[in-house]
Amino acid sequence: LGAFPPAKTMELFEALGVELKVERGRRVFPVSDKAEEIRQALLRYAQDADIVYDGAKKLLLEEVVPEAEPAPAASENPRHPKKKKAGPALRCVGVRGVSGREYRADAVLVATGGVSYPTTGSTGDGYKLAQQAGHTLVEPVPSLVSLVSRDPDCKKMMGLALKNVTLTLLEDGKAIFDEQGEMLFTHFGISGPLTLSASSHLGDMKKHRYIAEIDLKPALSEEQLYDRITRDFALLANHAAQGALVKLLPSSMQPVMVARWGIDPATKANQITREQKRELVQLVKHWQVSIDARGDLAHAVITSGGVSVREVDPKTMQSKKALGLYFAGEVLD
């Protein structure tokens, strides 16, 4: 990644004729919003490099083909019989498909992706090949994924999309992610671009407690929000509590906010005390959703975990377990 960072990736695609755009959260997409454009650019790039594809739509690999690597020779100087530093005991000389056909090669590059979103072809095949060569796997878990919450309020607001809000992810009370953008309430928890970005910062959920804290009005300070609420309530003086929130919050959130606020829904806006308005300010600026789990691998954008990077040379991406075997991309941890 140091030699080929995201900026160079963008330069590559632009050189291949793909016009790019950068959206909030530093997310990069083709201007056309068509994934097919990326696919075609990569196919052209491969064709220009004289890459030849197997005729099968999908090549099912059964195993890597290893051969024993000769032991390093001793020094030719008899007075200093030091052995050369021992390297991998195996050399990868190809792969074998489930049909039994062998593909012999000077080098094998495993770039099969992770195990998330299997409908795109990422079915975890590369992990099996890596293990055959003696590699250790870091347990694959979903990343860039929706988050599951047992909070019943999420289901009550299912389908509500929030724009221009700030999501802060708290780990044991400490902020580990903070970003402004869009998110969505679902029947199982929260989703959307902000949620996906936040999910990549989650650690071991068995060891830590996570809370998503949402600032529904990040453009306003607490004092500015208090003044805004006071003005709204003055204009809607004879409205009940929920009706008084009509200018402040989306309709599907209004009854949920009143319930969490703990105020009698029949209370008129002109009866709401200063203290109650302060409580409302805190709820709007610090709406909390407990996070109980990550979404499943089948719907994750990427996989965290995979082939241990300790067993791969970072300069060449060659396996430290078998010469001629290389790894690239999401198959790695």
Regions found by a protein language model. Give the residues of each.
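Conserved N-terminal/central alpha/beta ligand/cofactor-binding core
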Residues: 1-49, 185
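An anion/pyrophosphate-binding glycine-rich loop and adjacent beta-alpha core
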Residues: 19, 135-141, 148-268
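Flavin (FAD/FMN) cofactor-binding core of flavoprotein oxidoreductases
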Residues: 28-32, 143-152, 294-311
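A glycine-rich dinucleotide-binding beta-alpha-beta segment and adjacent secondary-structure elements
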Residues: 52-55, 255-333
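A conserved short coil-to-beta-strand element within the FAD-binding core of flavoproteins
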Residues: 52-70, 76-91
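Glycine-rich phosphate/pyrophosphate-binding beta-alpha loops
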Residues: 116-118, 146-147, 190-193, 302, ...
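Glycine-rich beta-alpha-beta "Rossmann" dinucleotide-binding loop(s) and their flanking helix/strand
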Residues: 118-138
